[in-house]
Amino acid sequence: MGSLEKERTTTGWAARDPSGVLSPYTYSLRNTGPEDLYIKVLSCGICHSDIHQIKNDLGMSHYPMVPGHEVVGEVLEVGSEVTKYRVGDRVGTGIVVGCCRSCSPCNSDQEQYCNKKIWNYNDVYTDGKPTQGGFAGEIVVGERFVVKIPDGLESEQAAPLMCAGVTVYRPLVRFGLKQSGLRGGILGLGGVGHMGVKIAKAMGHHVTVISSSDKKRTEALEHLGADAYLVSSDENGMKEATDSLDYVFDTIPVVHPLEPYLALLKLDGKLILTGVINAPLQFISPMVMLESITGSFIGSMKETEEMLEFCKEKGLTSQIEVIKMDYVNTALERLEKNDVRYRFVVDVVGSKLD
């Protein structure tokens, strides 16, 4: 058992201002309580939303900020009331580390929609301390907000699944799109998009990758196993694909028109938005008279557990580039340029942090 109310320090890499440049930062972890796990971080993925946060693109950033919400680690200590985990377990945690536990979303295992949820970084915990993310040596997380990483799934492979994997898996299940034989589109072939191809194919779907240019065609068809490739600027190709898809996953994290992709949907088809965009959506209303624009935000811890088991059963892994922490600023610059196939993962435990 762990010692209750024990405060420790750790070193992470933090942004100090909207330049988004990260550098070593030593800080106090929040007190570890009876329901908490004290975790050594092994690996942490880099998500495009980390860039939005460290650069204050959403106008809500507080500094110093240690980013990282695709975290896999090893349990070093457990609180006296922890029942599901023990020292030595390999666990994952994501972007939500607190909720009210009493609202409708919390009571229906959808805690990520709780209005009082606490983000794993760039937020304030119940004790008044700022939350900090997984680009750090250690973290403290409540038992409710971690999941066991299945044996046989490497830590660096599991990390992106904590965000990118469940972001795709959750809406397919939630919106009744899990059955085989469906035809789906994946708009954008990045960290989330490439997992979209893999998970949809594993569910038995016919998958079309939609991209702004032809340069990812070989990757999509030969390496990821997509069935078709569509260039959004190809008017003839887009016209031929009209009314052909049951759903389109829109993973693009910047402002873009929606009408071209609504036109690809069958009647009652769904355009599922997962990219973080800091601007109002614009579309012509007749385009959605018999289709739907909807969205999805990561997944609950229960859905994350289901997704990990699904990936284990199907042998799915993310395609990653593993880096050390001293390369993280270069990696963030490359990510902004879409120069990664398909997710950076920081080898935190193998990095010099101070």
UniProtKB/Swiss-Prot annotation:
GO molecular function, one term: coniferyl-alcohol dehydrogenase activity
Binding annotation for Zn(2+) 1: C47, H69, E70, C163
Source superkingdom: Eukaryota
Quaternary structure note: Homodimer.
Protein name: Probable cinnamyl alcohol dehydrogenase 1
The family this protein is said to belong to: Belongs to the zinc-containing alcohol dehydrogenase family.
Cofactor note: Binds 2 Zn(2+) ions per subunit.
Organism: Eucalyptus gunnii (Cider gum)
Catalyzed reaction equations: (E)-cinnamyl alcohol + NADP(+) = (E)-cinnamaldehyde + NADPH + H(+); (E)-coniferol + NADP(+) = (E)-coniferaldehyde + NADPH + H(+); (E)-sinapyl alcohol + NADP(+) = (E)-sinapaldehyde + NADPH + H(+); (E)-4-coumaroyl alcohol + NADP(+) = (E)-4-coumaraldehyde + NADPH + H(+)
Alphabetical list of InterPro entries matching this protein: ADH-like_C (IPR013149), ADH-like_N (IPR013154), ADH_Zn_CS (IPR002328), CAD-like (IPR047109), GroES-like_sf (IPR011032), NAD(P)-bd_dom_sf (IPR036291), PKS_ER (IPR020843)
Alphabetic keyword roster: Lignin biosynthesis, Metal-binding, NADP, Oxidoreductase, Zinc
